[in-house]
Amino acid sequence: MNIAFFTRPKQEITYLYTDYTVRQALEKMHNSSYTAVPVVDREGHYVATITEGDLLWFIVKGEGGEPHTMAIENLEQFKLTDVGLNKFKNQPISISSSIEDLIIRSMETNFVPIVDDRGIFIGIVTRRSIIKHYYEKNILPHE
């Protein structure tokens, strides 16, 4: 079994582009009900995972870094790159990585971004899909 078995392709999930505005990101996340989503550049490379908290703290810090100084209308002026994406928070793994690497990484986060050998984002593996698979394979048959 390999990582591709668990991977949900990017066509089936919500992700954002680095040039989206903060408003666009909030709308897309709200419509999908996800609290964290992958961010990719226009060439398709995985850049980071952004959370509702990242966006909230960007708004709260305001334009000058002072609390409560950002007007809602200004959310259209700022791109996701202005938010300060944390590229180390949810690093991707390669589609050719081992299942062991996938499981270890999934213990730290709700989903693991998957990239090809060129760093192109191809999808995610959710912690839920891993747990469900192992439950159905190892626990359910014994009940």
Residue ranges and their predicted role:
Residues 34, 46-63, 108, 121-139:
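Short beta->alpha transition motifs characteristic of CBS
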Residues 51, 56-81:
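Helix-adjacent hinge/juxtasegments
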Residues 12-15, 53-63, 87-91:
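Short, mixed-charge, low-aromatic patches
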Residues 13-16, 46, 74, 90-93, ...:
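Short N-terminal micro-motifs specific to bacterial/archaeal maturation
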